[in-house]
Amino acid sequence: MSKKYQNFINGSWVDAKSGKTYENRNPANWEELIGLFPKSAKEDVDEAVKAARVAFEKWRLVPPPKRGDIMRRVGDILVSRKEEIAREMTREMGKVLAETRG
């Protein structure tokens, strides 16, 4: 069974409003199903944008040094997961690993 992915909207993982999904396959090995992804439409995007606007109103009130600390931690997490992210990008897009590593 492959992994089923969802949209992250307003702090929750949700399916597309239509309930529809699409398959994403490894272009180097078409038999490898990477996962099922939500087939999002305008309504899903509108909901995500609305949630982002509300979140921004709170985020903009966070003092800049605190925002900087949060963004630095996000960067640290991404760096610590660089190899994992590179391998997933290679599987998903068919790029060579050296390129997805940056």
PLM regions and their residue ranges:
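Terminal low-complexity tails and localization/encapsulation signals of metabolic enzymes
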Residues: 1-36, 69, 73
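Glycine-rich loop-to-alpha-helix module at the N-terminal edge of alpha/beta enzyme cores
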Residues: 30-102
